[in-house]
UniProtKB/Swiss-Prot annotation:
Pfam families noted in UniProt: DNA_pol_viral_C, DNA_pol_viral_N, RVT_1
Protein name: Protein P
Annotated site, Priming of reverse-transcription by covalently linking the first nucleotide of the (-)DNA, chain positions: Y63
Organism phylogeny: Viruses, Riboviria, Pararnavirae, Artverviricota, Revtraviricetes
Region Spacer: start-end pairs: 178-346
InterPro entries xrefs: DNA/RNA_pol_sf, DNApol_viral_C, DNApol_viral_N, HBV_DPOL, Rev_trsase/Diguanyl_cyclase, RT_dom, Viral_Replic_Matur_Polypro
Domain notes: Terminal protein domain (TP) is hepadnavirus-specific. Spacer domain is highly variable and separates the TP and RT domains. Polymerase/reverse-transcriptase domain (RT) and ribonuclease H domain (RH) are similar to retrovirus reverse transcriptase/RNase H.
One GO term of the biological process aspect: DNA replication
Comment field (misc): Hepadnaviral virions contain probably just one P protein molecule per particle.
Residue ranges of the region described as Terminal protein domain (TP): 1-177
Domain called Reverse transcriptase: residue spans: 357-600
Amino acid sequence: MPLSYQHFRKLLLLDDEAGPLEDELPRLADEGLNRRVAEDLNLGNLNVSIPWTHKVGNFTGLYSSTVPVFNPEWQTPSFPHIHLQEDIINRCQQYVGPLTVNEKRRLKLIMPARFYPNLTKYLPLDKGIKPYYPEHAVNHYFKTRHYLHTLWKAGILYKRETTRSASFCGSPYSWEQELQHGRLVFQTSTRHGDESFCSQSSGILSRSPFGPCVRSQLKQSRLGLQPQQGSLAKGKSGQSGSIRARVHPTTLQSFGVEPSGSGHIDNGASSTSSCLLQSAVRKTAYSHLSTFKRQSSSGHAVELHNLPPNSARSQSERPIFPCWWLQFRNSKPCSDYCLSHIVNLLEDWGPCTEHGEHHIRIPRTPARVTGGVFLVDKNPHNTAESRLVVDFSQFSRGNYRVSWPKFAVPNLQSLTNLLSSNLSWLSLDVSAAFYHIPLHPAAMPHLLVGSSGLSRYVARLSSNSRIFNHQHGTLQNLHDSCSRNLYVSLLLLYKTFGRKLHLYSHPIILGFRKIPMGVGLSPFLLAQFTSAICSVVRRAFPHCLAFSYMDDVVLGAKSVQHLESLFTAVTNFLLSLGIHLNPNKTKRWGYSLNFMGYVIGCYGSLPQSHIIQKIKECFRKLPVNRPIDWKVCQRIVGLLGFAAPFTQCGYPALLPLYACIQSKQAFIFSPTYKAFLCQQYMNLYPVARQRPGLCQVFADATPTGWGLVMGHQRMRGTFVAPLPIHTAELLAACFARSRSGANILGTDNSVVLARKYTSFPWLLGCAANWILRGTSFVYVPSALNPADDPSRGRLGLYRPLLHLPFRPTTGRTSLYAVSPSVPSHLPDRVHFASPLHVAWKPP
């Protein structure tokens, strides 16, 4: 007869009328019983012949094709001009005094951030914008291009101008080497004023491996300046700039852009204005160097007198193609839907390309992309605005994947210990948090996005015309792309974008200037950044709590008035660092803080209501006695696992589901198991904060017996059959809790200490979780454990009781500078250390 739910509850000792714990609990560790219950609940039956169910409510398989919906009305969000101050460390120090080592290290990490992949795969430009919405291809193309353009205008992207130069908008940082009229302009690290140098575009910035005497001669040539020799001095009349003594070699070396192989910047300015010497003079300039070979960072030996001449390079770089868009103006319309009708709507279509306010030199960047982009809804609640998804998954896959750094994510207990209090809370919204953190230009060649231009994009979609590079723009295939669909789409888009259609129809390659969201490095850097900032804020305002996880920053203070003044001060401080806050999205929570999916109040933490709703919905739609695909089970476990700490039996209750996912088998919910889970999740108990205290109850066990010490009372008992040591220790802890009612227990077993009950027999894990809920454990070394003797059957020997203080931990939750505790209303009594305690040291 199948096990009824009532009987199952009784078995797990969840009801009060169970017999004495010492008899009942060890039975749950019995393998035979666990197996019989599993069979009764149909948990072990993994080989099913009925077809699997692949959808439960909203949950589909993990790699489900949930088709994103294209919205033709999408607005591109606006981005403020975000410029994080470069001297952020100094500004923080002015505000709060010297920073701790931790804070400094974290802030240096992001100023600028660097990215070193092992290998970068370059994809053709056609793959730049993903054909994610085949029905709305053209519309999606222009919306995505507009989004990229917006990011470039906001200073978040670089635009690749040539192989070795890029332009951007916004304020430059000192590590971005400016080119003006083809010259390098060096900003010194102190930023007193710009030093402008005349560059001879040698493009080699590797560390020079010579002795000091040659090195001083070379210093200028390494930066592309002429070595000062008699023969040259005559040749360089009227050249601007000279090296002043103020530029230290360290600042010159710190532009860590190290191109592999020789090359130079093709600077797009005419060669007269870039004050290049004649090649004859250049040969003399380098003749004294030709004996050396200089090693560049990638290990190629570079001969310095071998530089390609400027003119030949620029011709090979820029094929002279007429503009595809403007060509339609002079051609005869091929039909009613010819693009020439649209092109003739305007006299002035504006320039073919736009250039940024600043030009900088970059490492060699090919005309390729390294990741595709597409648009989706900004979030489930905001479908009016779009969000750009960048797929840089190549860096986290395959043999050359980058192993991203790990960082601490606060767990539930740490979070509750830290934030569960009677403070008033508000949360700040950092707008476009990722785009605050600047990336070094050396990362640009690895993080490229872009598009191949409208003509290629359309041709690729309508696959009847293959465009090869050499036919590009010839008249016979100019009209191949004309079609009714394209005509109608462009006519509608003309209303939105006007003459920008021309600009957006050109190919473009953009690299990231701020960290992109699609790379595993970014969340790590963001977490380091916000936690360091919060650490500074906590020290600046001792009686408040500031805490952050990623871009979610919360502030807590004793009273609402205190909180408001704190809010003003912190906002001004963050703005002075260049951090952009979104004032409309500041939320005031009162005494119960909503953070990371939890509601945290003085009683402890609970899941937010929308998660509880989702769980109810999930149980409503959960089919009984039907095999459910294990990928759907993954989704269900993800949802239930989040709320598991708030239930009686916790994670152990989900163990059968975990087992089926691990074996990649379908799972069948029996009515009893479903009713059990349902009941578990209908009554949620808050996770309370742990309080400091003294440990006075100790438990210990051997495979055959257990022992407890409660104050001066001692107890011992034996097991019917020998048990594995971890199981015995867990039973001893349960007995100690139920006998003494104490919520701080001393144990010498690391598995019990970790409160992970998922490795024990299933029924025992579930029961123990409920008995030990809210218990804190203190580690006692076996040699000092007072319960060691009773567990071995010796009640006569007394070990002195230890005074073991328990201090709740906040884990590694980014509290680098611990904020002083909020003062209670009564001042503590002053404690004078006795001179004996201080002065006397044991021999």
